Curated annotation (Swiss-Prot):
UniProt KW keywords: Chloroplast, Initiation factor, Plastid, Protein biosynthesis
GO-annotated molecular function: ribosome binding; translation initiation factor activity
NCBIfam families named in the record: infC
Primary location class: plastid
InterPro entries, per the entry: T_IF-3_C_sf, T_IF-3_N_sf, Translation_initiation_fac_3, Translation_initiation_fac_3_C, Translation_initiation_fac_3_N
Name this polypeptide is given: Translation initiation factor IF-3, chloroplastic
Higher taxonomy: Eukaryota, Rhodophyta, Bangiophyceae, Cyanidiales, Cyanidiaceae
Membership in a protein family: Belongs to the IF-3 family.
Gene3D superfamilies given in the database record: Translation initiation factor 3 (IF-3), C-terminal domain, Translation initiation factor 3 (IF-3), N-terminal domain
Localisation per UniProt entry: Plastid, Chloroplast
Signal peptide: none
Length: 185
């Protein structure tokens, strides 16, 4: 039980939560720990009832008339919410987008080097953005650039899938690859 302090969330959505004595409404609708409505009570009576139950009175909805408060162990509730948020962050994809740059006139050995780079990035679980740059009048040879990116896609098709097929953005052609999810069978 957290004796009437004004607790602040780190979230920008909720700047603060009112609990116990900090609830400034004359009467509130009280909801039990199990979700059962206890009815409309005077705020002081509701705080007293919460203390007798060993829980906190937390303002849930101040917009409704009368405002809705819930009886919960706020410390435990806050811990569970923070734990869920932390687990959610763990599950988020930490995949970075790695970039491999080349031109359409790339030599065979250099192409193999870029292919190996992309292969390593994909193996480590990162997305790969392949950027093909054209300088000056080279933009007239878009078909050669498309052929090169198609060749790269076929060379990496065993471990990568195309997230975005080759597209032109100004004087560059871009291809985005993501690692294939391998079934553990």
């Amino acid at each position: 039980m957290l004796g009437g302090e004004l607790l602040k969330y780190k979230s920008s959505k909720e700047s603060h939560i009112l609990i116990n004595e900090n609830i400034n409404f004359p009467c509130v609708r009280v909801v039990d720990v199990t979700g059962k409505q206890l009815g409309i009570l005077d705020t002081r009576q509701a705080v007293e009832y919460a203390k007798n139950q060993g829980v906190d009175l937390v303002l849930v909805n101040e917009i409704s008339d009368p405002p809705v408060c819930k009886l919960i162990d706020y410390g435990k509730h806050k811990f569970i919410v923070e734990k869920r948020v932390k687990e959610g962050r763990k599950k988020q994809s930490g995949a970075l987008v790695k970039e491999v740059k080349m031109t359409y006139k790339i030599n065979e050995h250099d192409y193999e080097t870029r292919l190996n780079q992309a292969f390593k990035f994909l193996k480590s679980g990162n997305k790969v953005k392949v950027t093909l740059t054209f300088k000056g009048r080279e933009i007239q040879h878009l078909s050669l650039g498309t052929m090169l990116l198609n060749r790269l896609m076929t060379d990496l098709q065993q471990i990568a899938e195309v997230k975005r097929s080759p597209y032109q953005d100004g004087k560059t052609m871009i291809l985005i690859l993501t690692p294939k999810i391998v079934d553990p069978q």
